Amino acid sequence: GPATIISYISKKRTYEGGLMFPGVRLSLDALSHHTAQLPNISLEHPRQLIGKNTEDCMRSGIVYGAPAMLDGVIDRIRETLGGAEPSIVATGPNAPVIARYCRNHVVYDKYLLMEGLYAIYQKNAK
């Protein structure tokens, strides 16, 4: 998507803050639209870490780079929390590809956003 957002939700289920940075799709679009002659590519699993052609290099950079960035941020969050082990849930159209390459345990929940919206609806319908 256009943005990757990390939200910290406390054990009391309150939003405590977060981080936001360019998402996978925005990063791919930036490479193809703002650099000389790089193609638009699809986001799919790379054949190997080190690409052998332009498209494979772009794909590996995104598919391995985004999880490495997330792992680094998760490690820093863990340090900020005094070593507490956070639960990590990924959503969004690119999450299944990216979460697979994270070294931290990441649970993919395809319906988390819809479940949250439904919970808000139910709360307000009362």
Regions found by a protein language model. Give the residues of each.
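Gly/Thr-rich phosphate-binding beta-strand-loop-beta motif of the actin/hexokinase/Hsp70
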Residues: G1-Y15, L31, L117
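A short acidic Gly-Thr/Ser loop motif
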Residues: G1-A3, V24, T91-P93
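C-terminal nuclease/phosphodiesterase catalytic domains that cleave nucleic-acid phosphodiester bonds
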Residues: S10, P22, Q37-L38
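ATP-binding/phosphotransfer module of carbohydrate and carboxylate kinases, centering on a glycine-rich
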Residues: S27-K126
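Short, acidic/small-residue loops that bind anionic groups at enzyme active sites
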Residues: Y15-S32
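A glycine- and small-aliphatic-rich helix-loop capping segment at beta-alpha/alpha-beta transitions
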Residues: K11-E16, N104-Y108
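Active-site-proximal catalytic alpha-helix in oxidoreductases
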Residues: I5, L19-M20, G65-A66
